[in-house]
Amino acid sequence: MAERGQQPPPAKRLCCRPGGGGGGGGGGGGSSGGGAGGGYSSACRPGPRAGGAAAAAACGGGAALGLLPPGKTQSPESLLDIAARRVAEKWPFQRVEERFERIPEPVQRRIVYWSFPRSEREICMYSSFNTGGGSAGGPGDDSGGGGGRQHGRGAAAGGSSSSPAATSAAAAAVAAGTGTPSVGAASAADGGDETRLPFRRGIALLESGCVDNVLQVGFHLSGTVTEPAIQPEPETVCNVAISFDRCKITSVTCSCGNKDIFYCAHVVALSLYRIRKPEQVKLHLPISETLFQMNRDQLQKFVQYLITVHHTEVLPTAQKLADEILSQNSEINQVHGAPDPTAGASIDDENCWHLDEEQVQEQVKVFLSQGGYHGSGKQLNMLFAKVREMLKMRDSNGARMLTLITEQFMADPRLSLWRQQGTAMTDKYRQLWDELGALWMCIVLNPHCKLEQKASWLKQLKKWNSVDVCPWEDGNHGSELPNLTNALPQGANANQDSSNRPHRTVFTRAIEACDLHWQDSHLQHIISSDLYTNYCYHDDTENSLFDSRGWPLWHEHVPTACARVDALRSHGYPREALRLAIAIVNTLRRQQQKQLEMFRTQKKELPHKSITSITNLEGWVGHPLDPVGTLFSSLMEACHTDGDAFSGFSDCTDNMGQCKSLEYHHLPAHKFLEEGESYVTLAVEVALIGLGQQRIMPDGLYTQEKVCRNEEQLISKLQEIELDDTLVKIFRKQAVFLLEAGPYSGLGEIIHRESVPMHTFAKYLFTSLLPHDAELAYKIALRAMRLLVLESTAPTGDLSRPHHIASVVPNRYPRWFTLSHIESQQCELASTMLTAAKGDVRRLETVLESIQKNIHSSSHIFKLAQDAFKIATLMDSLPDITLLKVSLELGLQVMRMTLSTLNWRRREMVRWLVTCATEVGVYALDSIMQSWFTLFTPTEATSIVATTVMSNSTIVRLHLDCHQQEKLASSARTLALQCAMKDPQNCALSALTLCEKDHIAFETAYQIVLDAATTGMSYTQLFTIARYMEHRGYPMRAYKLATLAMTHLNLSYNQDTHPAINDVLWACALSHSLGKNELAAIIPLVVKSVKCATVLSDILRRCTLTTPGMVGLHGRRNSGKLMSLDKAPLRQLLDATIGAYINTTHSRLTHISPRHYSEFIEFLSKARETFLMAHDGHIQFTQFIDNLKQIYKGKKKLMMLVRERFG
């Protein structure tokens, strides 16, 4: 808490004493009887608070007995202590003074004594975050008499009754046991070390003897707390002052200067000192009482001494006050009496615990500014948990703190920025807003809220609701759902124009809840008694108040009814919440049975029509009020709570991780449960009812994600419960209902196209039921495999559904933002069934048929095929041939689905399919090759499928004999030729390779290449095939293909690095090696296709180095002469080369820069070498140079370089 160095402000109340003052001087220390010190036993806590002196005495005696060591007797508590304690809890001291003219001093002392808080739980609550659930003790009285350790005058009378070891153990119990909330998270300033929490540090300071000079003057406690020296910090002494009233701390100050939301460790230490060691605290009456007993001389001496001791601080103020008092017309003389900071609260003062509003606002502002980083979301969730803890303690600061938090949320500048940019807020931030709205629902539904307080909240909520940036309930769009307090519109009412409805914000439901009340007599009877029945009531109508067994029912909009349960839990009424929850669940079960009977009747009357209207446009799972989660948590909490001392629960909803260590017990049945039923069975059944409800997929990304997230959270909670025979019966019962209940069930025969899919829920049901009822498990899972939103047409029976649904639920696809997640869940369900069906041919066939019918994603089917393959080929068992065939069948479907579409995993899929077919057997390989055109592209069929099938590894893997090898080879050759005919450009080479061993097939493939060479094949493909032919020992065929490739080629003058140059050189070398005729035939093609001078000169030189045909590829030698450059065909090549140099030179000179001059001179040098190969080359080159000098004489520097080199 933001403690400040100055003293607390003086009390507002003005104190004066008329002439017959109270109390004799020096009066004693209270009654001699000295009753128990903070007597408040946990047994007094349940239900309505104990009233009257007798109840207080009984509680006090029980507590005192618990505090005394064995063997000591306990005297009865005095009437003075009983009365004083009750007065101290309920009345402000001013009312006591006004009520009684004279109050004896012993009575004043006992009232002052009992006015300090007696529960350490509240001190802990205001000095640390709460990360666990509430304690088993439940909320304490408004007076603060909670479930912590209480010490009072009884302990004081006999001295300290605890040893140091016992004190230490008690401190640990207070910090970690059921007496206080568990604290496991750090505050914003303390990081993650639990020992640094203010409450823990306060206990450590107290037990280390660091608290000193403790003084209680009236309703004011002061003392010093010494902070031990910790290097490099020196020892510090903090002055602490605490004001209190009616067992609540109303203000705190500490000189440590620490600023935080919660009390600092020094305040904690002083408070716990007063609670644990009240006998060691000097107690004085309010200072005004002491002053009243002084005469004039004593008063003057008192004032002068006070000024002398503190003259530097007090003197200016003292002189100012003296001047005002001496002035007759001063304001101070217009008021009777004077303020007394130790005299307690006035009648008008609000009685609540001290909460530093400024620091709450500042901390929330800091957390929000961090934008979700540094654990700010966690810190804000802890603040929300603190609000819930305060509500459970029935502390008015809960609503006050939530108001401060909400104001900072509404002032977050990011809200307007997101609204302007049209972007959605982050998911974590959105969840914080949801929790904010849920907390306001709890607050306005407080069953004991005063009307004026509710009116104040309503006004504030409407103010926030009207702000433009106030977030919408559905995250992105205005919700079209009906009001909170009304049932869902059906029939003609459903046609109302939803576009005219205002947007619903996160506060809308809380605003609507302000209209709800708790005065209904039936509701009051339900929550107040376990014996509320009417066995004579036989009304069996839809809205009857009792069922046929006489048990009470509660008919209300289900989320609203569950919001009441949550409000009762949150405000510390767990028994009442449980009673209402049971009534709601019994109502749901009765409605479920009536829905089943109604559907069966309609089905008989209309046997050829299917009813598919959705009765729940507003689903319970993912609902902003989380009705199913509320009922489930309320019932599950009762499973591990003693029914006889039922006063509160640990919060299993807020911290489900802790509940894993709890064992859920089937406690004795409640009055309104069937024989053999328990809270566990009821919780599980209501969860199954909610999860199986048919409901429309909501609009907007956030709400759709919330539906998925809440469903998974609820299922994860169910999975923590171990199934026994009783729960299995519940599962069977609900599974049968889901299958037979028609439009009321998400697993009915025919559902609406936009219904939320049941894949995740069905997977849980399947795995749960499989060991107990496999047939039912498979029925559920197979029915849930549907994903109608992806179907091109609705089911036939859907055509006869009531048409009013269409206006309420428009066709929104593809606005299913979570579709990819839904499809993955569908895939998980199918994979689970495949795994379970291993070895069962009939089940596998059924599952396969369902997959092929309902899954529309090729990637998910491929994943299923892979999963099935892995399961079928586990290392520790023989391959399951049936499951392998299923895997292959799924793979074939993937091939067909992706054949005409682009898929980056296609090559992986093809390779995997061949692997799978190999495992199935040779007939599978033969089958996919024979029907390749429905599965693969020609390229895939030749380069991957046929090549892999013909590989040695496949032959070895399958242990094929010669006959089988030949059969596969024949199929592969047929495939290759078909592919080459269809796509010669990409398949010709593969076809030739595959047909090598069969002469006829090879010739056929070669002819296909020749036929395609003149039309569609590129020079690159032809050169590749030509090189292959040369490699296989067919030089003439290679030459033929090379000449065909040359006709498609075109190299310009500047493409001296073209990738085809090597192919051209290879083709010329091949022709040269074959003989003069072949060379003579290819040179005209080269001259026509190649314009690059350097390439032509390279070819020319290679042709002049050896005799044509001198070393043929076939090994023969030719002793002919070198070819002459003056005769064909080399003369034509030489002229073309010279011409290319001339043209290239002019082209380069057109756009030459000085930095390229030296490179150009080198180019001319190479050109001269080529010129000189002709018999008149010298003359030609000289003329060429002269011509350049004349044409480009403007390039003086360049021409000068030309002259220097070439003359």
Swiss-Prot record:
One GO BP: regulation of neuron migration
Disruption phenotype: Knockout animals born in Mendelian ratios, but show increased neonatal mortality such that around 40% survive to weaning. Mutants show a reduction in striatal volume and changes in medium spiny neuron morphology. They have alterations in motor control, including hyperactivity, impaired rotarod performance, repetitive movements, and behavioral hyperresponsiveness to amphetamine.
Keywords on record: Metal-binding, Neurogenesis, Zinc, Zinc-finger
Alphabetical list of InterPro entries matching this protein: Znf_SWIM, ZSWIM4-8_C
Domain of life per record: Eukaryota
Start-end of Gly residues biased regions: 18-40, 134-149
Bias-annotated ranges (Low complexity): 43-52
Stretches annotated zinc finger (SWIM-type): 238-275
Chain positions covered by the region annotation Disordered: 1-52, 134-163
GO cellular component: stereocilium
Tissue specificity remark: Mouse embryos and newborn mice shown expression in the central nervous system (at protein level).
GO molecular function, one term: zinc ion binding
Annotated function: involved in nervous system development, important for striatal morphology and motor regulation.
Protein name as catalogued: Zinc finger SWIM domain-containing protein 6
Source organism (scientific name): Mus musculus
Organism lineage: Eukaryota, Metazoa, Chordata, Craniata, Vertebrata
Gene: Zswim6
